[in-house]
C-alpha cells in the first residue's frame, strides 16, 4: 500500500497542462486535486475538467474557495515570476508547500540530478528549462576540477514557448546564471536563450562551455556520462548530441572571460539535446518536458516526506 497526496497546479498553459498529465500518469506519491487559471476559456482548464479534475478560473482566490483545497498539500505554480510572490504568500499561510516553475526563485534552486534529496524548503524553485538541461553538466565538471566560468546557450522551438516563457526572458537569464554558480559550482555564470522559429520545429538543443583548471579529460568525460544517466532517469529524452570536446588554453594565449579577466586552463564544450515525451505538446518541446519531469520528481519527494512526517493535510491510500 502507498499513499498519495493531492496537488494543485496554478497556470493551465503549456507547462501546467503537461505537468497535469504527468502527475496523472506517473505520479508515485501525488495525484491531481485542482487546476487553476484566470481564463474561463483556457484549453488547459477545459482539458482538466474533461479529465475529472476540479477547476477554477478565479486564480489563487478560486483555489482557496474550492472544497478540495483543505486536502491540498503541494501547489505547482506555472504562472509568472511576477504573480508567484502573492501565490506563495497565500499558500505558505495555509501550510502548503510550493514548487515554483517560474523564474521568481523565492526558495532554493532544485535540480533533481544534483540536489533533490538535500532540499526540503517550503518553496522550491525549479530554475528554468535551460538550467535543468545544462547545469548538471557544469556540476559534473565541477566534481572533477574548479570551474572558473560557465556559459550555457539554450535553443528552444518558438512554438513551445508560451506567453509565460516570453514574458520571463530577463528573469530566465538571471535565474539561470545564479543557479549555474550556486548549483553548478562555477565562479561566474552566463545564460543565453534562443527562441528558434524554424519550421518544422526543432527539438531543444543546449550548449555548455566551461573554463576550468587543468584536469584529467577522461575523468571529466566519465563524470559527465554519469550525470547524463542521472538526468535520463527522469527525462528519458535527454542525451549528449556528440562527444565532449576539450581545448587546452595555454598561459601565453589566455581567454578574456567576462567578469573574470584573463584565464587559461581547460575549456570543455558539451552539446546536448532534449526530446520531449509528447504528453501534451509534440516531442520537439523538450524544454517543457525537462521542467515538468523535474517538477514531478520534486513533488513526489515532497509528498513522501510530508506523509512520513505525518504533516500531510489530506491523502488517500492507493494500491
From Swiss-Prot:
Keyword vocabulary terms for this entry: Aromatic hydrocarbons catabolism, NAD, Oxidoreductase
GO biological process, one term: catabolic process
Protein name stated in the entry: Acetaldehyde dehydrogenase 1
Entry EC no(s): 1.2.1.10
HAMAP family according to UniProt: Ac_ald_DH_ac
Binding-site list for NAD(+): 160-168, 287
Catalytic activity, reaction form: acetaldehyde + NAD(+) + CoA = acetyl-CoA + NADH + H(+)
Enzyme class: oxidoreductase
Family: Belongs to the acetaldehyde dehydrogenase family.
One term of GO molecular function: NAD binding
NCBIfam families in the cross-refs: ac_ald_DH_ac, PRK08300.1
List of catalytic residues: 129 (acyl-thioester intermediate)
